[in-house]
Amino acid sequence: MIISEVKTDKERKDFIEISSKIYQKETNWIRPLDKDINAVFDKKLNKAFRKGEVVRWILMDKGNVIGRIAAFYSKKAKPEKNNLKVGGCGFFECINNQEAANLLFDTSKEWLKEKGYDSMDGPINFGERDKWWGCLAQGFEIEPNYLQNYGRDYYP
């Protein structure tokens, strides 16, 4: 497995399209518009970049994208009561493979550690709190709201 930071147009496309592969048989999943996902990572459109940073990765195995994740922090976030500096992760998608999932989360954790953060919260979104927060753990038979994280039954 090879994890790569998303930098090229192809990698940006792979980052978006992996969710379609993960949920291809899920009738209730609502695919977000590419522009809605891209807006989160666009410095011109997302005000969170003024006080924070985000990085995203895709995970490849044998030439196929098998997962993705993003990590981020905001300098305006106040330390928790226990004085921990908390960064975030989100946009996690992965095939049913624990080793792959661990690599994605560990990569996010290490990046945040390098930036001086002690802890990681997620799944959350870099920026506004009105979309892509939380993890669906049950209720897969119910159609979700648009811009709500979906999930697989093996995620929790």
Predicted regions and their residues:
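Short amphipathic alpha-helix that is part of the acyltransferase structural core
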Residues: M1-K44
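A short helix-loop-beta-strand connector motif used in the catalytic cores of GNAT acetyltransferases and
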Residues: D42-I58
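A short acidic/small-residue loop/turn micro-motif
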Residues: Y73-K75
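Acyl-donor binding region in acyl/amide transferases
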Residues: P79-P156
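An N-terminal domain-start capping segment
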Residues: L33-I37, A77-N82
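A broad, structural surface signal
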Residues: K13, E17-Q24, M60, D106, ...
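Conserved beta-hairpin
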Residues: V54-I69
